[in-house]
A protein has these predicted regions:
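Acidic (Asp/Glu-rich) sequence patches and key acidic residues
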Residues: 1-152
């Protein structure tokens, strides 16, 4: 069974979904450790900053891995092995390069989504009522949340 992470905007006491992502998505993977199950919690700038740091760390990791694979590919060409062995090495390295590019692209997508959420937070006009100050929420397997589902 696949779990879903959902994002909501609060309007009075109702919650309008603005995004839903399956467990295999990068959005889910980055938000998972910070998100309650069957409850919702407010999405704050500090939370987005933590996740952005995680994403940037992953991008840096995959960029370094990509650079190392490129260096290895250049080295393999100069090795004294058979052509078949070289080609096998190069094919494996090419797969690694492709995987790194794919992971970087997915992480960049998450960064864009974080910017989208930042824009929502920035554009809201806060009211004096504390219940309406926190208007962007996230939860896993929450269905149709109510104010009783909010984790404070």
């Amino acid at each position: 069974m696949s779990a879903y992470i959902q994002f909501f905007i609060r309007y009075n006491d109702s919650f309008m979904p603005i995004g839903i992502y399956v467990r295999s998505s990068h959005i889910y993977q980055y938000f998972d450790e910070y998100t309650p199950w069957e409850k919702i919690k407010v999405v704050t700038r500090p939370l987005l900053d933590k996740i952005r740091d995680d994403v940037n760390d992953d991008i840096l990791y995959f960029q370094k891995r990509y650079d190392r694979a490129k260096e290895m590919k250049e080295y393999v060409v100069t090795m004294n092995n058979s052509m078949d062995e070289k080609m096998e090495w190069i094919e494996n390295i090419e797969a690694t390069l492709g995987d790194c590019c794919e992971e970087i692209e997915k992480a960049e997508y998450v960064k864009h989504y974080l910017s989208f959420l930042d824009d929502i937070i920035e554009s809201v006009e806060y009211e004096d009522n504390i219940d309406h100050k926190n208007y962007l929420y996230v939860g896993i397997e929450v269905g149709n949340p109510t104010v009783n589902d909010i984790v404070r």
